Amino acid sequence: MPLSEPRVSIVILNWNSYQVTLDCLLSLRKMDYRNFEVVLVDNGSVDGSPEKLLASAPEIRLIKNVTNLGFAGGCNVGMRDALRRGTDYILLLNNDTIVAPDFLGQLVRVAESDEKIGAVNPKILFFDHPDRLNYAGGEQKGWRLFPKVIGLRDRDNGRYDRMREVSFLTGCAFLIKAGVVRQIGVLEEVYFHFYDDIEWSLRLTRAGFKGVYVPKAVIWHREHFDTNKNHRNGFIEFYLARGNMVFARKHVPRKLWPFKMPFFCAWMVYRTLVFSSQRDWQKVLSLYKGFWAGCVTRLPEEDTSV
């Protein structure tokens, strides 16, 4: 291990997903970057998976939450633990990913090249369709309902192989400088699921740091593997609608609401028509419950300190 390699703490969440998480851990063992640790945060699993994972991968640092704290809450537990022990970088990594052997080294090299770079993302490909892009950078603007994911579902044919600055970094896999986290804080837990990475990206750019997409770093993603367990009962619809409204209330200037709300209403109507045509009333109900929850959720004080 070169003396110049910064220490990286890889924070991974597990929730009742032994085999998927183990596949991710096994891919990390094959990396050529060696100065790292894995902080596995179990989010209240009831299937015995945390104990089985520790037996299969005894090198991990296991933290067990009593209940499911959501993506942001679970990640924050791991991030704060790593920061207390003096890490140089934190890598938030979804458990349903497989990484290329040189992926972490590529990310660290770019992050180390410029003090204004606060966080970096890899190129993300679909696991089941490895010739298709899941993420090749992202853009976020105040009036948009969701960030624009560059290259989504396009073929990985070299078109997106240029490193670029981005305004949206996906929480699927992003490497963050520890000093930046100490300055701008951890993830906002009010979202529980979705939108926490969007807000963190916004705070990053507002603090004067850059987010960068690094195409030479590659991972493969089983997108929405965990959330699909809950898709039939409207989990995704609820948290997308709720998160959008919470984010808008917190961060979208009032002067932009006349531009944003027509898009949001059109999205709600479209989703309603789609689910109604499928006679999936649970998703319709979840969509409007999420909208209402987003309108009435108490917004927390700006305290995301470490």
Residue ranges of model-derived segments:
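Short beta-strand-to-loop acidic/aromatic patch adjacent to the donor-nucleotide binding site
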Residues: 87-98
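Acidic helix N-cap motif at the loop->helix transition within catalytic regions
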Residues: 47-55
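Short beta-strand/loop segment that forms part of the nucleotide-sugar
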Residues: 36-44, 63-65
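Short, acidic, metal-binding catalytic loop of nucleotide-sugar glycosyltransferases
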Residues: 26-35
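Glycine-rich, basic loop-to-helix element that forms the pyrophosphate-binding segment
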Residues: 65-85
